[in-house]
Amino acid sequence: SYGMINKVCVGASAHFIAAQAGIEVPEDAKFLMIRIEKYGKEEFLAKEKLCPVICITEYETWEEAVANAKTNLLNEGAGHSTVVRSFNKEHIDYAGEQLPVSRIGVNMIGSSGLGGSYDNGLNPTATLGCGSWGNNSISENLWWHHLVNIARIAITIPETKIPTDEEVWG
């Protein structure tokens, strides 16, 4: 039915998916690329597909591209991950400030790199926390320290000086 991923396409090859859609592609095609013009709830393909279908779109400014990505993420995927392609630090920082994700890969492969890699500092895992955006308790890669119970002993320190509001807030 329209609006749902066809289960037979999940994990299938690009050639198989194209055949399901009545499109001829070489048997060794690695992925299908589709141009979309809408975002978020207005575009069925602007969400997780679990198959080798890549959607592309045009944009005029970096801010427009980030806004479109944010619309898609808020529809499906908030808290998870994204990848940006840029060597402009201001663009990278802007994406980091605007996008509701727990991981932003910069100029890397997201499907394997954001699950942790020796060259990006993320803990290797198959479980990616999505934080409160995704109704998870963690917003980082699940790691052994999340599975260890730690007891902390707290003892009142009598000589502690409690700061005034002025000292705290200036």
Model-based region annotation:
Residues S1-H15, F44-E48:
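Flexible, acidic loop-helix segments that line cofactor/substrate-binding pockets
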Residues G3-I5, A21, I34:
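Hydrophobic transmembrane signal anchors and adjacent membrane-proximal interface regions, especially
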Residues A18:
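Substrate-access "cap/lid" subdomains that shape
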Residues I23-G170:
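Conserved C-terminal structural/oligomerization subdomain of aldehyde/semialdehyde dehydrogenase
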